[in-house]
Design a protein with these regions (language model features):
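C-terminal extensions of enzymes
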Residues: 1-17, 24-33, 40-41, 145-151, ...
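Glycine- and acidic
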Residues: 150-153, 158, 218-224, 333-336
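A non-catalytic, amphipathic alpha-helix used as a structural packing/dimerization or gating element
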Residues: 128, 132, 136, 159-170, ...
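Structural signal for hydrophobic packing residues in well-ordered secondary-structure cores
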Residues: 137, 168, 172-175, 179, ...
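Glycine-rich phosphate/ribose-binding loops and adjacent secondary-structure elements
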Residues: 162-165, 174, 178, 186-307
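Short secondary-structure capping/turn micro-motifs that flank functional sites
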Residues: 64, 149-150, 227-228, 280-281, ...
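Non-catalytic, usually N-terminal nucleic-acid engagement modules in DNA/RNA processing proteins
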Residues: 1-185, 298-301
Length: 378
């Protein structure tokens, strides 16, 4: 399923295999299609044929609400529904549920919350999350967990960790049962456990030690990039990494900037996802190999250059900065689509170049050159 083929320090070059799409080269960035589509008018066809995407990520909570996981199941699963034949990871819905802080009630069984669409009450626990993700037929299901608020009181974070551990045990049991059913959508679906513990290193380490005893197919670090300083995020990764099984993939959830990804790889992380490339693109903020630019700025009005002269994405091969700026100022939907395509391609190319640097034994030099540069504004 997962094999580390080369290392440089803690950075790992690996190959991940799952039911759909054959081999995935890691480190990898997963493109976020929350409701089985990338916001900004980007389809699975774009991901596959134009953007170099390896894995797509969809949202359990949103797909449960609409069209309904039962609808997706009747359509043959998420792969057939959205016409994507590569790997799909579905998150458990926990992050979205727990972000509805004023609308939810937590118990040992799970969480009762109000739909953000129409306010009707919904219950979701470990078993419900596993059943929804089984209906979706994703390649990787994420365990149901609680993502605590930042900052969180120590005692609450500790109790939450303990409950999330018990929930993982229930997830594992239900996941195994569902995979064994004769009519399951994807009998090869994998399960990743999630490390929690807020910003408390001792809780993080304890929790990682406990969930590592449960035989999951991979392990994620969750509950970061929720308002804590970047340095604290890196400290938590450094604290947890030694306790993560070396033979399983490691996933840093919801992170992040290009610099975050480079620094995450340097700390032993294999999988990343973030809404940032698509979200920033929809506001005209574009990533380049010299830093980020705001295409709405007046200085690009007569600029004949592509977004990034170093980029060979479909957008940079065809269109100028001046044209992109015009589309945004005219509020044409095409501007958003082209911007999203460029940013997703950039993120996919970033992880490709990280892999190449690991293959060639020069990741440290790549990190030195780009970790700070990509955070600059131009």
């Amino acid at each position: 399923m997962f094999k580390v083929i080369k290392k440089e320090g803690k950075a790992r070059r690996g190959v991940f295999t799952c039911a759909h799409g054959g081999e995935v080269q890691t480190p990898v960035f997963m493109n976020v299609g929350t409701q089985a589509a990338i916001k900004g008018g980007v389809s699975a066809i774009d991901l596959k044929e134009r953007l170099g995407t390896q894995i797509e990520l969809s949202n359990t909570y949103h797909l449960h609400l609409r069209p309904g996981d039962d609808v997706v199941r009747q359509m043959g699963g998420l792969h057939k529904f959205m016409r994507w034949d590569g790997p799909i990871l579905t998150d458990s819905g926990g992050f979205q549920v727990f972000s509805l802080s004023g609308l939810r009630k937590i118990s040992e069984e799970g969480v009762t919350f109000a739909s953000h669409l129409d306010g009707h009450r919904i219950f979701m626990g470990p078993e419900e999350s596993m059943r929804i993700q089984s209906n979706l037929g994703s390649d990787i299901a994420m365990a149901f967990d609680e993502c605590v608020e930042n900052p969180a009181p120590y005692d609450y974070a500790k109790a939450s960790c303990e409950r999330t551990l018990r929930w993982l045990e229930r997830c594992k049991k239900e996941h195994d049962r569902l995979n064994a059913l004769s009519d399951t959508v994807n009998p090869g679906q994998m399960l990743f456990g999630i490390n929690q513990g807020a910003t408390y290193a001792d809780l993080r380490i304890w929790h990682m030690q406990q969930i590592a005893k449960i035989d999951c197919d991979g392990y994620a670090i969750g509950g970061l990039a929720v308002g804590e300083p970047t340095e604290v995020m890196y400290e938590i990764i450094d604290a947890v990494e030694p306790y993560m099984p070396a033979d399983k993939p490691r996933y840093l959830m919801g992170v992040g900037t290009p610099s975050n990804i480079i620094e995450g790889v340097a700390r032993g992380v294999d999988f990343f996802d973030c809404v940032m490339p698509a979200r920033n693109a929809r506001h005209g903020k574009l990533f380049t190999w010299k830093g980020t630019l705001n295409i709405k700025n007046a200085k690009y009005k007569l600029d004949e250059q592509p977004i990034d002269p170093e980029c060979d994405c479909p957008v940079c091969r065809q269109f100028s900065r001046a044209y992109l700026r015009h589309l945004f100022t005219a509020e044409e939907m095409l501007g958003m689509r082209l911007a999203v395509m460029h940013n997703l391609y950039f993120y996919n190319k970033l992880t490709e170049r990280i892999r190449d640097s690991l293959d060639n034994g020069c990741f440290d030099a790549f990190r030195e050159e780009y970790s700070k540069k990509l955070a600059e504004k131009i």
